[in-house]
Every structure is written in C-alpha cells, then in structure tokens.
C-alpha cells in the first residue's frame, strides 16, 4: 500500500465532501431551485460517499478498492451534473469532484498497491 497515495485520496475526499455540501447549500438559496434539485441530491450523495471513503481508508477496510471505485463513479456523476449549471459554486464543485475521482482511481492503480 502506498501511504502517500492514500493520504492524497483522503485529502481530496475531505475537500470534495466539503465542497459538495457547500454547493448543495448554495443551490438551495438560488432562484432556479427546481432546476437544481438533481444537483442538490447528487451533491449530498457525493459528500456522503466521500465521507464513507475516508472512513474506509482510515480503518484499512478490506473493501477499499471497491469503495474507492464507487466514490470515483459518484464524483464523476456529480461533476457532470454540476458542470451543467452556470453558478460559480457548481463549477467549482465540478472541478473538485473530478479531482477527487482521479485520486480515488489513482489510489487503487496497480502501481499504487505495494
């Protein structure tokens, strides 16, 4: 196990959980709330998945690979949805989600497991 890769993944997951929570809250306060309902739900789900991933890594869960894969997929879906909206918080969240997905995938790349 490459501890540096896991450390970066945890950092990205924490950042992503915070950004997704902030984005969901900001979306709730927008005028076009109906157009943002899917974004809000995906933000909440992504934040929850990122928190689960951090706990799994910290606890050395035997399913880390599967959990990281699901987290990466969740981040991709959230990033895609956020990118559809013009709001700065959505665009920022999309970028953070993409970075998190990349770190989740990198942590389980064959070279990362030593």
Language model features with spans:
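Amphipathic alpha-helical hairpins
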Residues: 1-114
